[in-house]
Amino acid sequence: MDCAYERRTPPTEKECLALMYENKVDEHIIAHCQAVAKMVQIILLELSCTNVLLDEDALLSAALLHDIARKEKNHADVGALKLKAMGYVAIGTMIATHMDIEVNVNAPLNENELLFLTDKLVSEDEACGFEKRFEKAFLKCEGNLEAQKNIMKRLNATKMIIKKIENLTGKVFHYG
């Protein structure tokens, strides 16, 4: 019998940290997740003057937990399944798309897109420009055309999400 609830209150920051320790997540991965959550807060503050509706608590919890399965193959899917099994369906859904996402430019900005983006604006536990992050990824995968194709897809998704934010705020995006 599946005991997951359709909707649970998102875990607090303290509860997220406890879940990370319970899942034996390394300190440097926890620090990365905390930096992503800080970036989420910065962008949410910028978006507060817009009419975009987001589940901010769930998004912050997803940021803190997005790499809960980082050491496992297909960590986004594995992490998503873990959170969904605990009853955090919305958070699991966000985590599932933090590595790869399909962006609909005609749809409103959503939590999945913000989690994807903020993860790309943080390297280790430091904010960085997405261009720098993707440049490093391209160099790392030099000669691997399939990997470079996937990186280019992620770069394009990042740019589309940034454009959505710029359209909402009327400002040039300058984070990371």
Residues covered by each model-derived region:
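Charged phosphate-binding loop/patch that engages nucleotide di/tri-phosphates or the phosphate backbone
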Residues: 146-176
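Residue-level recognition of alpha-helical structural elements
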Residues: 25, 29, 75, 107, ...
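Short, well-structured alpha-helical segments
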Residues: 30, 34-37, 56-60, 92-99, ...
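Short, charge-rich amphipathic segments
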Residues: 6-20, 67, 82-94, 146-153
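Alpha-helical structural motif
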Residues: 12, 16, 75, 110, ...
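Divalent metal-dependent catalytic cores for phosphoryl transfer on phosphate-bearing substrates
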Residues: 49-141
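Acidic/His-rich, divalent-metal-binding segments that scaffold phosphate/diphosphate chemistry
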Residues: 1-74, 126
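Residues within well-ordered alpha helices
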Residues: 19, 43-46, 82, 161, ...
